[in-house]
């Protein structure tokens, strides 16, 4: 039930910011290995002002993911990014837990009325919904 509450809050935030004409980024852990702080499916929303909701692990990984999300919002693009959580690697984030995660950064434009309408409909019927799927388009497009 806690996960469902969190998912409902995610859609409420997406709807609120879409209706107020603010773009945002959904950051979802798609793969984790080793001793990563959060597993696949963990997500957070990053708003254009740098505010975030939810978590993908906290600390330096979330700090770096927020920086990447803000760049993606500026460039209006979605992308995959690997984060290494052990010392002395190219993408070292200085976290001692050791491991690696891959995160998908899904850009959500306030102009995407289909997505905003889906959020509105989903929330209006939340209590009747038995099974919900949040689909991510993982296609990497070149800019």
Where does each model-flagged region fall?
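Segments forming oxygen-rich coordination pockets for charged ligands
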Residues: 2-143
């Amino acid at each position: 039930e806690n996960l469902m509450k969190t998912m409902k809050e995610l859609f409420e935030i997406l709807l609120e910011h879409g209706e107020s004409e603010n773009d945002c980024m959904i950051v979802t852990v798609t793969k984790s290995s080793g001793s990563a702080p959060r597993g696949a499916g963990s997500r957070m929303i990053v708003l254009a002002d740098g505010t975030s909701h939810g978590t993908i692990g906290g600390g330096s990984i979330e700090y770096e993911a927020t920086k990447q999300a803000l760049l993606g919002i500026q460039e209006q693009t979605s992308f995959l990014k690997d984060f290494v959580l052990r010392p002395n690697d190219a993408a070292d984030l200085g976290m001692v837990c050791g491991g690696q995660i891959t995160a998908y950064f899904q850009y959500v434009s306030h102009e995407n009325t289909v997505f905003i309408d889906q959020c509105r409909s989903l929330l209006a019927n939340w209590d009747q919904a038995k099974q919900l799927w949040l689909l991510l388009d993982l296609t990497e497009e070149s800019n």
